């Protein structure tokens, strides 16, 4: 296969959906030589914030001289963005070569009467093959969904698990209580490892503590009472945490302070594991971390922000950030959601702040909530709403309505933010 053929192949496989479970993934990797067994991992789960924490840690590790793999999903701007080494996307040739091998292994499985691997399983196997080929010193690995039964959880060579903030999401797959969801997220914890956790609601924290005790793991949790001296701006922030004074981050959004504190806890854990991370390397890594799509400013006059707040917990943080960064400002929204999310609560939290809201539909995704249906839901909270027939049209409408002193907030499903950013930038 060439690159285009490999992408078409994976797109075709993705139409069959995804399932939770590890047997098919284990069999696929066995046929590929179990590349994951030759790597070391930082495994990251959670509902919100896991991608940001991964970005902080991988940037710090790369800056300290460790060849660092990064596996994330979904991505905003390029398919190849999901697999990186030291910030560089996987090469098209490498992707095509490894997908060719994966497709052959999948065909062998089908001939043997075994279930065919899902697209996410194939992509995860692709990442493992590539990271092995690149001889990565460490891989920062983001869970796709949940943790316990996620395809990434076939790994056995983790040096540390990180659990970001847990809240109610994917309840159809992970469970209808916070404890059940936390059990899935904590399912990545391996025996005798270091575990670092965000501050959690009591119900979730109890599950994590019990899991760590059962598996003889040391647990470090963020103490938010030790966060101080927070100074926010749309271009970045500074804060202090425990013995770390005046740490600068380039990521905006009030929630990024909490994510950065979790990353600093991760740094301390890595130091316990003899990773050589100097204070200067940590500070530079925190300051230089880029994580597009999380309260990211795309332009000024008017200010345009894109943010992947797609569930109630994230919407609550977005609301807090909007009130903090834009007090008294006129806000216009471009909003797109998946129908399997609790979009009604997202609307309740965010819609009252907006002068006008334009709803859009994420193109080419069967989970997308139709723009007209989303507009009808918004109208129950804020009657100043319309729906657009495309993401580009929605962005154009918002920019036409907003004055230079106003702000346009494009948020919701991560899957449409890349297209929205292209529309803002005139691509």
Predicted regions and their residues:
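Extended acidic/charged loop-beta regions that coordinate divalent cations
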Residues: 123-173, 205-245
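ATP-dependent carboxylate-amine ligase catalytic core
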Residues: 27-29, 34-37, 63-156, 172
